[in-house]
């Protein structure tokens, strides 16, 4: 398997950064850059396997960040090694994976398989992974979880799976159309917890709960997607991150990250001003042009993820379009602080793992 390395370096600028929604106040200290990895789009949250962090992204490519070498290594770009499952209908595009640990050395990697983007034809399924010799070996599963085939239902893309405080698993997904939805997943099988054979959303189906809609004024349609929920282990809140507006146009992208929180995985999620995300609320976490970060390099941030290290520190990941390299889609990984129960990027500390 071909292997690539991406050397990175940490740049330090001595500037003052004021406190704002998405960035914590550095108190006049040095401001640090994130870890950056180029050629990454739609990243899943990072997970640790052995002595490396694992990153999965569209179109299901993956990398390792060695905690010893402090370097990135490209590992692969063919999830099923040519043996794609039949449920992807033959030539579907794999997008926006989400990884969840289900037991010691066992994982599931959820992803969408888009076969008719123009008509929102897509399915969400998963691969089963087992850790052997420090690597995750993935195997296809012969069935899928949910599907969509029209604009009158949640578009079955951008899955994100997480456990709640009671050990139940949840799938949050959706893009444009009817917005962001959540449905319970059986933690043992990986499929829908109720009626797993019935894979399509309907307006009267109480298995599915609506979480968020677009609240911006840039577009007439429901421009929201890339939902991610973080179950904070030390407070009572679940944090819902979503993207508003549009991706995939380099430095012309208008993606921005919004946030709300709830004491229940199924909501309602409220922003800092008490507005429900289900009615278009959403506090701005990262803006489209890097103003909150204090650096215009970071255009169109999207696909939030949070990794908790063994020392209890949290790190926030997202993709962006790098204005310093012609709009190349790239990963950024930052320190994350929690201030008054809300997350903020912490640029006062370098991204280092102890």
Model regions and ranges:
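Bacterial N-terminal signal peptides
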Residues: 8-18
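Carbohydrate-active catalytic/glycan-binding domains of CAZyme proteins
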Residues: 20-354
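Bacterial N-terminal signal peptides that target proteins for export
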Residues: 1-8
């Amino acid at each position: 398997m071909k292997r690539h390395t991406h050397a990175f370096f940490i740049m330090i600028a001595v500037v003052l950064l004021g406190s704002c929604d998405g960035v914590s106040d550095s108190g006049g200290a040095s401001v640090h850059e994130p870890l950056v990895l180029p050629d990454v789009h739609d990243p899943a949250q990072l997970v640790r396997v052995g002595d490396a962090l694992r990153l999965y992204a569209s179109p299901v490519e993956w990398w390792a960040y060695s905690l010893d070498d402090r370097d990135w290594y490209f590992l692969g770009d063919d999830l099923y090694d040519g043996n794609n499952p039949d449920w992807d209908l033959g030539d579907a595009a794999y997008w926006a994976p989400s990884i969840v640990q289900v037991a010691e050395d066992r994982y599931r990697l959820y992803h969408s398989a888009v076969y008719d983007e123009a008509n929102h034809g897509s399915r969400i399924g998963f691969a089963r992974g087992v850790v052997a010799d420090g690597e995750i070996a993935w195997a296809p599963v012969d069935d899928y979880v949910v599907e969509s085939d029209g604009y009158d239902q949640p578009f079955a893309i951008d899955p994100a799976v997480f456990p709640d405080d009671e050990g139940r698993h949840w799938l949050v997904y959706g893009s444009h159309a009817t917005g962001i939805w959540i449905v319970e997943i059986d933690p043992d099988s990986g499929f829908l917890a109720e009626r797993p054979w019935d894979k399509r959303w309907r307006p009267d189906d109480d298995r599915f709960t609506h979480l968020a809609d677009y609240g911006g004024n840039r577009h007439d349609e429901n421009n929201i997607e890339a939902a991610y929920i973080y179950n904070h282990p030390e407070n009572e809140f679940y944090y819902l991150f979503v993207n508003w507006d549009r991706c995939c146009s380099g430095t012309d992208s208008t993606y921005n990250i919004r946030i709300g929180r709830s004491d229940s995985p199924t909501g309602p999620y409220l922003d800092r001003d008490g507005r429900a995300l289900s009615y278009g609320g959403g506090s701005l976490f990262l803006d489209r042009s890097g103003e909150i970060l204090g650096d215009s390099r970071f255009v169109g941030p999207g696909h939030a993820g949070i990794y908790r290290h063994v020392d209890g520190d949290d790190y926030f990941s997202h993709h962006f379009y790098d204005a310093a390299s012609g709009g190349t889609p790239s990963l950024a990984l930052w320190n994350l602080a929690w201030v008054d129960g809300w997350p903020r990027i912490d640029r006062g500390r370098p991204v280092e793992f102890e």
